[in-house]
Amino acid sequence: MGSFSIWHWLIVLVIVALVFGTKKLRNIGSDLGGAVKGFKEGMKDANSDKPAEQVTQQKVADDTIDVQAKEKTNS
């Protein structure tokens, strides 16, 4: 019941290859590799010395409405 031997893993690999097919497994492998590459590039960009662009927020006076809230009284 402990660890699996190499024969167990080979049988599992053969069953997976029969179920999914080698072309599908190749596509999954290339997609996974692309995802890892993109993650590494993203981490490299995050650690770079470039300062982040400042996002400026423009206030539009026409869209601002000044209101006062009043408490509702039961009469």
UniProtKB/Swiss-Prot annotation:
BP GO annotations: protein transport by the Tat complex
Superkingdom of origin organism: Bacteria
Membrane topology: Single-pass membrane protein
Annotated region described as Disordered, given as residue ranges: 44-75
Keywords per UniProt: Cell inner membrane, Cell membrane, Membrane, Protein transport, Translocation, Transmembrane, Transmembrane helix, Transport
GO cellular component: TAT protein transport complex
Main location: membrane
Pfam family, one: TatA_B_E
One example GO MF annotation: protein transmembrane transporter activity
Membrane-crossing segments per the record: 1-21
Subcellular location: Cell inner membrane
InterPro entries cross-referenced by the UniProt entry: TatA/B/E (IPR003369), TatA/E (IPR006312)
Subunit structure: The Tat system comprises two distinct complexes: a TatABC complex, containing multiple copies of TatA, TatB and TatC subunits, and a separate TatA complex, containing only TatA subunits. Substrates initially bind to the TatABC complex, which probably triggers association of the separate TatA complex to form the active translocon.
Function statement: Part of the twin-arginine translocation (Tat) system that transports large folded proteins containing a characteristic twin-arginine motif in their signal peptide across membranes. TatA could form the protein-conducting channel of the Tat system.
Cross-referenced NCBIfam families: PRK02958.1, tatAE
Assigned protein family: Belongs to the TatA/E family.
Protein name in UniProt: Sec-independent protein translocase protein TatA
